[in-house]
Regions:
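Hydrophobic core
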Residues: 18-23
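Extracytoplasmic metal-acquisition and chelation regions
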Residues: 2-13, 24-310
Length: 310
């Protein structure tokens, strides 16, 4: 279903408002003069910023290092969300703490682009997720490319946006995504098939596993959300699976505490390392994963190293 609903404006009204605005401010180029695109997560925010440059004000609601399943926004941000020219969201059940605000904006007629509508959505690989759709599509660069291809025409059609600039920037960024995909394929090809086994603290790598032929052995937190909690039997079953699969490294999400992962590694009757990955959130500029491309390259290197033959 296409959830993008364009906002129609009368040309005469828009022209009149432009003249009045120029007389009142006496200048151009401020944030108020540019279209406003509100983006739910910082990963999508980075993608949008790469496509639009300075033509558009991009308001990313999710802070660096936050959990996309549970982050919340201020009253001021909620008000700006309802006045945006476009909202870009994941839309596959990821932004649990934000959904009420997205729904409110939709009811007020704010146009929206839902990335999940452009993705070949996969169900969670785990039975404890109850067959729910997996929102973590960005772990497969090919899925991110599909989102870019669907989003670009929407951005090009916005009032106040230079379509030529968006087309040029999107072509360049798409090339970078294709290069990333090739790099990941080469890096993971060096891992023997028997060792392509992933254990994480949260079910986040379903798309990566499907694209690059990994097995998802399990996750510390059951189900598809970080808001769940594992039982003692859940952890015992996962320890057994780790031992049976001969898993060498458990990967912990940087935005989540790793104490359960560390405890799990100690319980397993094999030599298991714990490695931090950036999977659900970008970081501050100095944090190691300030943008999507860097995040994916860091994760690729750490996965390839962690699962390499010893």
């Amino acid at each position: 279903m296409n959830r993008f609903r364009p906002r129609f404006r009368f040309a005469a009204t828009a022209a009149a408002l432009t003249v009045v605005g120029a007389l009142l401010t006496g200048c151009a180029g401020s944030s108020e003069d540019r279209p406003l695109v509100a983006v739910s997560t910082n990963i999508l925010g980075d993608v949008v910023t790469n496509l639009v440059g300075d033509d558009v004000e991009v308001m990313t609601l999710m802070r660096p290092g936050a959990d996309p399943h549970s982050f919340e926004i201020s009253a001021a941000e909620a008000a700006r969300l309802r006045s945006a020219d476009l909202i870009v969201s994941n839309g596959i059940g990821l932004e649990e703490g934000l959904q009420q605000h997205l729904d409110a904006a939709a009811q007020e007629g704010v146009p929206s682009f839902v990335a999940g509508d452009a993705v070949d959505v996969l169900p969670y690989t785990s039975t404890d997720a109850g067959g729910a759709d997996d929102p973590h599509f960005w772990t497969d660069p090919a899925q991110t490319i599909a989102v870019v291809d669907a989003l670009v025409p929407v951005l090009e059609g916005m009032d106040g946006v230079d379509a030529t600039t968006v087309a040029s920037r999107s072509a360049s960024y798409r090339g970078e995504l294709e290069a990333l995909d090739a790099e990941m394929s080469d890096a993971f090809a060096a891992i023997p098939a028997a060792q392509r086994a992933l254990v994480t603290n949260h079910h986040v790598f379903g798309y990566l596993a499907d694209r690059f032929d990994f097995r998802v052995v399990g996750a510390v937190i059951p189900g598809g959300t970080t808001l769940a909690a594992p039982s003692a039997s859940d952890l015992a079953d996962l320890v057994s699976a780790i031992e049976e699969a001969g898993v060498r490294t458990i990967f912990a999400e940087s935005s989540q505490p790793d104490r359960l992962v560390q405890a799990l590694a100690r319980e397993a009757d094999v030599d298991v390392a714990v490695e931090e990955l950036f999977t659900e959130s970008l970081t501050e500029p100095s944090g190691g994963a300030p943008d999507y491309l860097t995040m994916m390259r860091v994760n690729t290197e750490r996965i390839a190293t962690g699962l390499a033959p010893r």
